[in-house]
Amino acid sequence: MNWQGWAEIALTLGLAVAIGWPLGVYMSRVWNGERTWLDPVLRPVEAVFYKAGGIDAQKSQSWWGYAGALLAFNFVGFLLVYAVLRLQGVLPMNPQGFSGLSGHLSFNTAISFVTNTNWQSYAGETTMSTLSQMLVLTVQNFLSAATGATVAAALARAFVANRGEGVGNFWADLVRTTLYVLLPLSFVVAIVLVALGLPQTLAAGVTAHTLEGADQKISLYAVASQEAIKMLGINGGGVFNANSAHPFENPTPLTNLITAVSINVLGWAAFFAFGRSVLAKKDIRALVIAASILLSAGAATVYWTETQVAPAQVAAQVDTSVNMEGKETRFGAPATAAWVAMTTGASNGSVNGMHSSLMPLGGGMAMFLMHLGEILPGGIGSGIAVMIVMAVLAVFVAGLMVGRTPEYLGKKIEAREVQLALLTVLAIPVATLGFSAIAAVLPEALKGLMHSGPHGMSEILYAYTSATANNGSAFAGLTANAPWWDTTMGVAMAMGRFMPIVAVLAMAGSLVGKPKLAPSAGTLPTHGGLFVGLLIGVILILGGLQFFPALALGPIVEHFQVLAAVAGH
């Protein structure tokens, strides 16, 4: 560890928040239908979509109408992705000559990209055709990100309304987020990445003549365009199996900084957009501070663990001052640590190093950040929505202490809101721990493990944590392309995505009809240090405590095993 490493981590985390603030102001204008500088160009395009779909963009939907449209849209997206992947072998733009995917892999991949998880049970360069990468996977990177943003927009309207009825129009929110936010930003970032050396071609690849005299086929794709939305949309699915550790996806420290910042920038922007939309910037600033504290602590922990000399290297008398296993030398430990925290604190899941090669406590921290609910800052819209749920639970706990009906952002928090909040936060532990418990004893599931003992348990726990939290990163020792893993992880991804979405929209439906209350003497201030501390406590208890027994069986036991093995060497 040195000051340069800490400065690199601070710069990466800080840039994302700093850039996210002005983008949040712009995003709130998009959500609220206000005029933007892109209106002269995009308003006519927007109108074409509404006319083609028969959409009345001014018609506000009830929460269940909004949720129904969202679920129907995503189900159709799932069917289209599944069909293209199954029929890949007979479809055009397949210069690689790849055959169609199996039923279970198509099922898993379709759910993965529709839910913004981007878990990949395959290697992209040996499995996916150019058409599959561009037509369905990249398109879903846009649409799944926009879907998450619509949830936050609907929830914001519920807090603003005074005895209102509707929470907005799903189709209008989806179109506007895609056209005005995701497409322009992705275009700019893609151009920058092309200039910095990322491939952007429809060619299948090139043949290289190696020094040994053999020929090697090097795969090429339209990498830059997919990389841009992969990061900005907080998706994470890589064109290549090595993801952002691959030199075609992330060749230099500069591209690493740009793409790392891109992981979190729109997540933070959604926080600021929510604050501007509900006219409560100070209250949302408290949420940003709480999330930043937890994310910074996570990054610091990973950096500390990875800059300790690995005990096995000490025992073998290997001269090294840092654990470089699984890391790219062009990035080093600080950039890897920052990426680990940012990709698991958000629902991104891309990697610039191998998480399975992290020290046990470093890998455990990656899991722990996902266990907190993907709210640091989480996905576009989905992160702030779940953070608002945590804030609702925090004011509920505070209300119990003083014997008053809690209020948050001018709305009374009553039994229905608390029930829906609990349903939201229970989705991750129920699916993660339930499936992990079954997989730990089922022979069919255990066939996919490369390791036994606590690291094998960590592989299982990490996989289902990543799936349910819609993250998508993995411990690479798990062979997941098998019927059991593809099917159960697909179900876990759907549970982790749509249970919280429906619960949050139901909460929005409950809040929208309530009167907007002015703060009174008995209202708990939700913008000061006391509330930040209370919120962090609620997040740690609801997120961390539920998973501690499982973590104790995996990374914590492995940590002490490593120490014991070295002590007995």
Swiss-Prot record:
Location in or out of the cell: Cell inner membrane
GO MF annotations, alphabetized: P-type potassium transmembrane transporter activity; potassium ion binding
Membrane topology note: Multi-pass membrane protein
Matching InterPro entries: KdpA (IPR004623)
Key words, A-Z: Cell inner membrane, Cell membrane, Ion transport, Membrane, Potassium, Potassium transport, Transmembrane, Transmembrane helix, Transport
Annotated function: Part of the high-affinity ATP-driven potassium transport (or Kdp) system, which catalyzes the hydrolysis of ATP coupled with the electrogenic transport of potassium into the cytoplasm. This subunit binds the periplasmic potassium ions and delivers the ions to the membrane domain of KdpB through an intramembrane tunnel.
Subunit relationships: The system is composed of three essential subunits: KdpA, KdpB and KdpC.
Similarity comment: Belongs to the KdpA family.
Name of the protein this chain belongs to: Potassium-transporting ATPase potassium-binding subunit
Organism: Caulobacter sp. (strain K31)
